[in-house]
């Protein structure tokens, strides 16, 4: 939003012509890469995953200092997407492919731990869940599997989440193998989830699939255009 009122970007009419809206925002950080984006239009779709703020800015700075950097170099700065709900990325091949081509797949697992007491009674504790997984529906799915006896050994499911974070407790029957139960939960519930990456964005009003370097290059070009326009406007006022 900074400098939006200083004629740094073009304004266009909204859908019914009643207001003027900015064609793009004069952002100072690579928001598209940081926040990600998801949407469907006629004949195309986009699913860009979120990335770490500091890593994204550092990557942009690295390109400014060394414009010939390759995607492989940028992956040392931004090794993977950064999900607000946490989770564990299972494998990196899909991430590398997406960084190079703009398309790929990432498999995300919940972060879990197993607690076993002296009576051989175990609990599976879930402390982070995959990106965009609804926690209430996840808990209900596990409970439904227990009711339908599709997974033997489930005793009780509780959502103990609070302001400090996610905590889902899955109590198991005595003598049950918790590793087997956990693998079944990964297979049958969104505790393991795959996300397709499709980095489609409008570049000069034309949809294009972008790799990691292209996303950052376009952001840098945008910032240069905004800064140049701002400078010219400032000089005009002084004249």
Regions found by a protein language model. Name each.
Residues 2-6, 31, 62, 66, ...:
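Conserved helix-loop functional segments at active or binding sites
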Residues 11-16, 75-83, 158-164, 200-205:
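A glycine-rich phosphate-binding loop feature that marks nucleotide/adenosyl-phosphate handling sites
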Residues 23-27, 34, 210:
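Core structural elements
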Residues 29-53:
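Conserved phosphate/anionic-ligand binding catalytic regions in large, soluble enzymes, centered on
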Residues 44-104:
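Conserved glycine-bearing catalytic or ligand-binding loops at nucleotide- and phosphate-handling centers
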Residues 104-227:
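Gly/Lys-enriched N-terminal cap/neck module of very large, oligomeric protein machines
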Residues 229-236:
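Conserved small/polar residues in nucleotide/adenosyl-binding loops
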């Amino acid at each position: 939003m900074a400098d939006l009122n200083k004629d740094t970007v073009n304004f266009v009419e909204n859908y019914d012509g009643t207001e003027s809206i900015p064609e793009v925002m004069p952002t100072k950080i690579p928001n598209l890469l940081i926040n990600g984006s998801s949407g469907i239009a006629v004949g195309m779709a986009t699913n860009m995953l979120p990335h770490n703020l500091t890593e994204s800015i550092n990557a942009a700075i690295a390109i400014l200092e060394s414009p010939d950097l390759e995607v492989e170099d940028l992956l040392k700065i931004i090794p993977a997407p950064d999900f607000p709900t946490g989770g564990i990325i299972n494998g990196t091949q899909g991430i590398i492919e997406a960084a190079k081509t703009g398309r790929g797949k990432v498999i995300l697992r919940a972060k879990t731990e197993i607690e076993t007491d002296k009576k051989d009674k175990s609990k599976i504790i879930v402390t982070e869940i995959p990106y965009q997984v609804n926690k209430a529906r996840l808990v209900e799915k596990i409970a439904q599997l227990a009711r339908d006896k599709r997974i033997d050994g489930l005793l009780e499911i509780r959502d103990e989440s609070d302001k400090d974070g996610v905590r889902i407790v899955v109590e198991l029957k005595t003598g049950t193998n918790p590793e087997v139960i956990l693998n079944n939960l990964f297979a049958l519930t969104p505790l393991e989830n795959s996300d397709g990456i499709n980095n489609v964005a409008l570049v000069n009003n034309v949809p294009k699939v972008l790799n990691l370097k292209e996303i950052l290059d376009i952001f840098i070009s945008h910032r240069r255009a905004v800064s140049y326009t701002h400078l010219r406007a400032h000089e005009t006022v002084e004249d």
